[in-house]
């Protein structure tokens, strides 16, 4: 009988980690707000590291401010830095939303961030006037870097945004809230595409599609200050409390749906990322349940195209091939189910996160695929390297961080997730939805053919 075999970590040291710290997830979330600006309350490196990572992956600049704490802040605190930082941002950039993202240093110091924000609001009102100051919303996001990971930081940020900005009204707005998780601009656009085909108006918490894949064209908006096009408008964030329901497409982003449900009696569904046929079917059914809108022929046609593509290649090139998957826990579970749908064997799944959601989800995949799956939960790429040397596979699926391991082991690597920095265009190419599944079918098959398609067989295929 198929089962999930969880392999426990045998060392305390982390070698080549798969996850990073909480603030990255919070900065990503705030960057998806129209005229939104993250302000990192920490040292310069806390923002520089993330900006560098975003620039490598998205090939776009990221506007992230920092209070630039130094050694003296460890003794005297960062009050002056945060208050002046908020004031400077408000005066120079005039953002709609400023997200104050805490870090290791500010959390360990014990800075009264909430108190500093109140003082900063008073100072901003003195300089800019009450009316202008009231238009700028400040969201406090606690993300201590010494615990958890970027996915927890993202979850904390989305909850803080909702709790701070949502304003209940007497009537529903007829909109559906979607929390996409940490995904690429191409995935966000695919989510909006599916909602559009069903005639559903959605509120993305948050929409990073244009901010991280912005068109290079003259802006019609005020050029001083200049903001990237797109993002979730402040009005939509305030209107969240009046929506039909909330669907989170990442199991780690469950705090905001729970908060909205508790405060406003709003139905919610926390699920896996809609990767592959089964997961996308589930997403479409949930949207239909929440809105009452029918599934259109256009969506059924897109689904049919993927099924046809799978039938073309699965039995011929993919069936029975063993796969190692690593990275974002929500994406890895979705990818494990999808490769099983292709007739492949998800031999091992490795992620830097461990919680009951992912364990239970992967158990379901093992049962559905009738295959034993080895799971490296809460581990790193070193653990995966050791495993693969003893248990070889035919394909690796994950981020660019595993490229050297794949090269050393002679295993082809199909790149998904974050970060991908040694190839271009992956941030624009969806893996979510039926169109994303089609990209995966083609990409996985071509990666297999590049490695295992023998030259002596070429004439037979002509």
From Swiss-Prot:
Entry GO MF terms: ATP binding; iron-sulfur cluster binding; metal ion binding; nitrogenase activity
Gene3D superfamilies: Nitrogenase molybdenum iron protein domain (3.40.50.1980), Nitrogenase Molybdenum-iron Protein, subunit B, domain 4 (1.20.89.10)
GO biological process, one term: nitrogen fixation
Broad class of enzyme this protein falls into: oxidoreductase
Cofactor: [8Fe-7S] cluster
UniProt remark on cofactor binding: Binds 1 [8Fe-7S] cluster per heterodimer.
Domain of life: Archaea
Keyword Iron-sulfur part of the UniProt annotation: yes
CDD domains in alphabetical order: Nitrogenase_MoFe_beta_like (cd01965)
Annotated [8Fe-7S] cluster binding sites: 21, 46, 104, 145
Enzyme nomenclature, EC number: 1.18.6.1
Known catalytic reactions: N2 + 8 reduced [2Fe-2S]-[ferredoxin] + 16 ATP + 16 H2O = H2 + 8 oxidized [2Fe-2S]-[ferredoxin] + 2 NH4(+) + 16 ADP + 16 phosphate + 6 H(+)
Keywords: ATP-binding, Iron, Iron-sulfur, Metal-binding, Nitrogen fixation, Nucleotide-binding, Oxidoreductase
Pfam families found in the cross-reference section: Oxidored_nitro
Family that this chain belongs to: Belongs to the NifD/NifK/NifE/NifN family.
Biological function: This molybdenum-iron protein is part of the nitrogenase complex that catalyzes the key enzymatic reactions in nitrogen fixation.
Quaternary structure and partners: Tetramer of two alpha and two beta chains. Forms complex with the iron protein (nitrogenase component 2).
Protein name: Nitrogenase molybdenum-iron protein beta chain
Organism ancestry: Archaea, Methanobacteriati, Methanobacteriota, Methanomada group, Methanococci
Gene from which this protein is expressed: nifK
């Amino acid at each position: 009988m198929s089962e999930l075999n969880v392999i426990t970590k045998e060392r305390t040291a982390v070698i080549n980690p798969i996850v990073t710290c909480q603030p990255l997830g919070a900065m990503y979330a705030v960057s998806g707000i129209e005229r939104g600006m993250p302000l990192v309350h920490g040292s310069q490196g806390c923002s520089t590291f993330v900006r560098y990572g975003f620039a490598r992956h998205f090939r776009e600049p990221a506007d992230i401010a920092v209070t630039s704490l130094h050694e003296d802040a460890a003794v005297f605190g960062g009050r002056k830095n945060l208050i002046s930082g908020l004031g400077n941002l408000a005066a120079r950039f005039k953002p709609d939303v400023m997200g104050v993202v805490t870090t290791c240093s500010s959390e360990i110091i014990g800075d009264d961030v909430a108190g500093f924000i109140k003082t900063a609001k008073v100072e901003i009102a003195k300089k800019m006037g009450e009316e202008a100051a009231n238009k700028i919303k400040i969201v406090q996001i606690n993300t201590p870097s010494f615990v958890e990971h970027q996915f927890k930081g993202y979850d904390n940020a989305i909850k803080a945004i909702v709790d701070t900005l949502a304003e209940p009204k007497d009537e529903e707005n007829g909109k559906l809230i979607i929390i996409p998780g940490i995904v690429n601009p191409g995935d966000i656009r695919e989510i909006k595409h599916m909602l559009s085909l069903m005639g559903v108006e959605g509120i993305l918490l948050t929409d990073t599609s244009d901010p991280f894949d912005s068109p290079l064209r003259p802006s019609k908006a005020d050029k001083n200050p200049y903001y990237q096009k797109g993002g979730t408008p402040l009005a939509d964030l305030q209107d969240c409390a009046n929506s039909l329901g909330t669907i989170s497409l990442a199991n780690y982003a469950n705090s905001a749906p729970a908060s909205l449900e508790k405060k406003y009696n709003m139905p919610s569904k926390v699920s896996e990322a809609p990767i592959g046929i089964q997961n996308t079917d589930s997403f479409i059914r949930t949207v239909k349940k929440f809105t009452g809108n029918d599934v259109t022929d256009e969506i059924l046609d897109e689904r049919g195209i993927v099924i046809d593509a799978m039938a073309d290649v699965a039995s011929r090139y993919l069936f029975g091939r063993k796969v190692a998957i690593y990275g974002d826990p929500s994406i890895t579970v979705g990818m494990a189910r999808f490769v099983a749908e292709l007739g492949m064997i998800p031999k091992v799944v490795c992620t830097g996160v461990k919680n009951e959601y992912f364990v239970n989800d992967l158990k379901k995949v093992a049962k559905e695929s009738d295959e034993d799956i080895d799971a490296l939960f809460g581990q790193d790429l070193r653990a995966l390297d050791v495993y693969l040397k003893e248990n070889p596979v035919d394909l690796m699926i994950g981020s660019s961080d595993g490229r050297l391991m794949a090269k050393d082991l002679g295993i082809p690597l199909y790149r998904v997730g974050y970060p991908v920095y040694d190839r271009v265009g992956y941030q624009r190419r969806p893996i979510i939805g039926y169109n994303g599944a089609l990209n995966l079918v083609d990409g996985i098959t071509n990666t297999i053919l590049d490695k295992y398609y023998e030259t002596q067989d070429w004439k037979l295929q002509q």
